[in-house]
């Protein structure tokens, strides 16, 4: 057996449970296995795994299952945050950032290309089982919008705003809410990196007073508000609220198209791990950051789109196998987002599975002598059930 020597190690990391796989059961696994038996090697491995078309706007069905390259410059400006940690490790290991073109992202790109900005923003929701690639599909969409010169409002993990926060301060604006200055300041730095070209063009439409000595006058660049939040960390939460309010208000003027992209959207409803000094729990709506982000999720503005993804990884107080919108959002969250267009992200299909294996082989990530064989591929299929995250983790040990 190809993986005999590492079975014990793998089992420590993830005990395989056939009951875990809801969408991709025995039938689907057998389908991919049959594909591996019957495939005819008419294309080179590189043609299977890669495309030379690196512009997301030009991606179509013909590119499905192939990897495209994100330039180092785009990686630095579009994704100062938001890429999954293990994908970042892979980028460093392979010295390149390659995303697979998948059907959920292609569906979203089709919708966004045909957006009518005169109508209220449409909400799209990526959902699926754990490890199927929701975050990377969201990143594909973000890359597309950035290359189309949209302004990107990206929240890479909303769960970080509702748990394990180091500093909570009573809001100076509303005593019933709490500020999270460190989280807000970090987000503003990344927002500035991605959208710096817009920050001098957009002017604030009212005066904002920070303290007795400092204020931002009406007509000042939005960049001044961002800088205030970065340099005066105590004001960072208020600065985020102002940025969101100004963008929502001005998106209809036609100066820019706005993408609101939120990963882990289910964090905005439900429970938090945060407590007051008297140990009583803090509700999400009591956090100023969450309060303001919830406003952005309403489709009472136009000039852009709202794309979000559900996440089990950081979700609190939810069953491990929950993945459906009504399960992770709860009634309050579901009602708040309704209506939305749901987009399912599933495990790899046969073409995607083969492409992923070939990509790892090209980068010498699979060193075992049986890795390129049909027997080896079937073992990897059995171990991972074609789940992208599990496949990546198992391949890391070969």
UniProtKB/Swiss-Prot annotation:
Ubiquitous. Residues 1-21 form a transit peptide. It is an enzyme of class 3 (hydrolase). The modification N6-acetyllysine is found at residues 175, 207. One of its GO terms (molecular function) is RNA binding. GO terms for cellular component: mitochondrial inner membrane; mitochondrial small ribosomal subunit; mitochondrion; nucleoplasm. It comes from the Eukaryota. Changing residue 380 to R: In PRLTS7; uncertain significance; decreased thermal stability; slightly decreased GTPase activity. This is Small ribosomal subunit protein mS29. Changing residue 395 to Y: In PRLTS7; likely pathogenic; decreased thermal stability; decreased GTPase activity. Its EC number is 3.6.5.-. GTP binds at residues 100, 128-135. The keyword Methyltransferase does not apply. Belongs to the mitochondrion-specific ribosomal protein mS29 family. Residues 52-66 have a biased composition (Basic and acidic residues). Keywords: Acetylation, Apoptosis, Deafness, Disease variant, GTP-binding, Hydrolase, Mitochondrion, Nucleotide-binding, Ribonucleoprotein, Ribosomal protein, Transit peptide. It catalyses: GTP + H2O = GDP + phosphate + H(+). Residues 39-67 are annotated as: Disordered. As a component of the mitochondrial small ribosomal subunit, it plays a role in the translation of mitochondrial mRNAs. Involved in mediating interferon-gamma-induced cell death. Displays GTPase activity in vitro. Pfam families: DAP3. It is linked to Perrault syndrome 7: A form of Perrault syndrome, a sex-influenced disorder characterized by sensorineural deafness in both males and females, and ovarian dysgenesis in females. Affected females have primary amenorrhea, streak gonads, and infertility, whereas affected males show normal pubertal development and are fertile. PRLTS7 inheritance is autosomal recessive. Some affected individuals present with neurologic features. It is found in: Mitochondrion. It comes from Homo sapiens (Human). GO terms for biological process: apoptotic mitochondrial changes; apoptotic signaling pathway; mitochondrial translation. Component of the mitochondrial small ribosomal subunit (mt-SSU). Mature mammalian 55S mitochondrial ribosomes consist of a small (28S) and a large (39S) subunit. The 28S small subunit contains a 12S ribosomal RNA (12S mt-rRNA) and 30 different proteins. The 39S large subunit contains a 16S rRNA (16S mt-rRNA), a copy of mitochondrial valine transfer RNA (mt-tRNA(Val)), which plays an integral structural role, and 52 different proteins. Interacts with DELE1. Interacts with NOA1.
């Amino acid at each position: 057996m190809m993986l005999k020597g590492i079975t014990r190690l793998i089992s420590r990391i993830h005990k395989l449970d056939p009951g875990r796989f809801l969408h991709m059961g025995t039938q689907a696994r057998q389908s991919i296995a049959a594909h591996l038996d019957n495939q005819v090697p008419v294309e080179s491995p590189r043609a299977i795994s890669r495309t030379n078309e690196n512009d997301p706007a030009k991606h179509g069905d013909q590119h499905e299952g192939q990897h495209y390259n994100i330039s180092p410059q785009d990686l630095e400006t579009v994704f100062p945050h938001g890429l999954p940690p293990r994908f970042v490790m892979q980028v460093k290991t392979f010295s390149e950032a390659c995303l697979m073109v998948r059907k959920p992202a292609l569906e979203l790109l089709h919708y966004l290309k045909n957006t009518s900005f005169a109508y209220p923003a449409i909400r799209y929701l990526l959902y699926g089982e754990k490890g199927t690639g929701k975050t990377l599909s969201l990143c594909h969409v973000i890359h597309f919008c950035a290359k189309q010169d949209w302004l990107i409002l990206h929240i890479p993990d909303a769960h970080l705003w509702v748990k394990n926060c180091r500093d909570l301060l009573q809001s100076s604006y509303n005593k019933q809410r709490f500020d999270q200055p460190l989280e807000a300041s970090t987000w503003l730095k990344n927002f500035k990196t991605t959208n710096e070209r817009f920050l001098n063009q957009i002017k604030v439409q009212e005066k904002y007073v920070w303290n007795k000595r400092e204020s931002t006058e009406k007509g000042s660049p939005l960049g001044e508000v961002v800088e205030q939040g970065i340099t005066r960390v105590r004001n960072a939460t208020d600065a985020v609220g102002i940025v969101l309010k100004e963008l929502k208000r001005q998106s209809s003027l036609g100066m820019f198209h706005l993408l609101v992209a939120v990963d882990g959207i289910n964090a905005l409803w439900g429970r938090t791990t945060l407590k007051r000094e008297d140990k009583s729990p803090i509700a999400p709506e009591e956090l100023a950051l969450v309060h303001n982000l919830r406003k952005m999720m309403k489709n009472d503005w136009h000039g852009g789109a709202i794309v979000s993804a559900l996440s089990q990884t950081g979700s609190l107080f939810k069953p491990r196998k929950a993945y459906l919108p009504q399960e992770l959002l709860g009634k309050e969250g579901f009602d708040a987002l309704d209506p939305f267009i749901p987009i399912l992200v599933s495990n790899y299909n046969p073409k995607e599975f083969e492409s992923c294996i070939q990509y790892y082989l090209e980068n010498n990530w699979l060193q075992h002598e049986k890795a390129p064989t049909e027997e080896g591929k079937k073992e990897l299929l059995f171990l991972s059930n074609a789940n992208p995250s599990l496949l990546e983790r198992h391949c890391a040990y070969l």
